[in-house]
Amino acid sequence: MDEKARALGTRVIHSPAPLVKKGDFIRALRAELRHGSYDVLHCHHDILSAVYLLAASGMPIQRRIVHVHNADESVPSGSRLKQRLYREPMRQVCLRMADHIVGISNYTLDAFLARRARRPERDSVHYYGVDPTPFETVSGDRVGFRRQLDLSDDALILLFGGRLVPEKNPVFAVDVLAKLRGMESHAVAIFVGSGSQERDVLQHARELGLEDCVRLLGWRNDLPEIMSCSDWFILPHPEHPVEGFGLAVVEAQLAGLRMLLSHGILDDPLLPTASFRRLPLADGPTLWAKAAVERLQQPTPSRAAAIAALHESPMDMDRALKGLLKLHT
């Protein structure tokens, strides 16, 4: 990633001190800010952006932006007491010292503001810009992809894409697969991503006798191709706190996938063309599997229609870039 950024003309600087050593980190950041004569400080570290703002205190920086990507308001401390003690003061630092508070979704912004009214010209939503090009050029070789994974040519693929961590709830997808195979015997599950629950996913699949029906692919650079060869996309995100945005949800639509979503997924990433069912996790895997079968009986979503809808949305790359540049001027 560093080399890609440098190739585009950026300068990549790694802090000589980790964030956990707060004093050393702040001193190093202040030294760089002083040396670089920066015009804009754009912080992407959610509530921890307070550390960057404090480090920049008194510096002649024209604009300070806090960009919030998650709604969990995580404070990296093993002590729950410290997390509670630090969270609100850090939020107040952001609200008082930043010129702009930007959320990647309506919920994310309002959660960070803690139900305070949005301030005109200061608090706003800026969606990710999504490039549809990779989805326009996929081959969509469904049979070839299945043979690569030693699956039957007519396998129906339930795709989970993202980190395999409790915050994404991947184990629930295995339960859904177990019920789904009772309705569609050719159903299989593919997990693209990695994380702390990789072993849990495999172990649960073994316990349910599904080991031969589950594939863990790790992180892949060809996710658009994998999506285009799948049948469903599942994201059973926990309902509290909700997903900050859900970029993979947008990508699944561009790939023409039917989607099974929990109430932990917001409306923000949904295009008008979306084919989806949103269900409570409490409904259990049987109802989720039934919803998958019902979606399968509907016409295959149009990739072209989804791409056209994206271009008319705030997630259009050109529109998102203009909005980002406006924040800096």
Task: List the model feature ranges, each with a label.
Residues 1-23, 195-198, 327:
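N-terminal strand-loop element at the rim of the active site
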